[in-house]
Amino acid sequence: MVKNLTHHPVVIYKNGSVFLIIEPEGPVPRCKEERVQIGEIDGIPFTNTRFGIVQDLPEKKEGVFLIVSPIVANALPKRDDLLVPDDLVRDDQGNIIGCRALARVSWWGCEKFSW
């Protein structure tokens, strides 16, 4: 079972057509944010934003996957039940209208390399 814990319907495309629409349900998990203005660039505030603990995320349940924002998924890399829209589909103006897959978030390439 997949639950959508974002504000927007998640539209899944398959073979160029809408395959499934997963409507939002339940509270939307968010990371606590802290912003500190550290200056201005051309009159635009320049801030340092830190993301903290995740709020409003249900406990993990066997067989249940949760679609969440990439920030939430990144904050909890050990939660293998968290998914994000992947392989995005865009309209002619470049707006995101759906995705072709759901993905777990993982990091690579952040290690220190010796050339």
Feature names for model-found ranges:
Residues 1-13:
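Hydrophobic/aromatic-rich, well-ordered segments within soluble, folded domains that form packed cores
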Residues 7-8, 16-115:
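Intrinsically disordered, low-complexity segments enriched in small/polar residues
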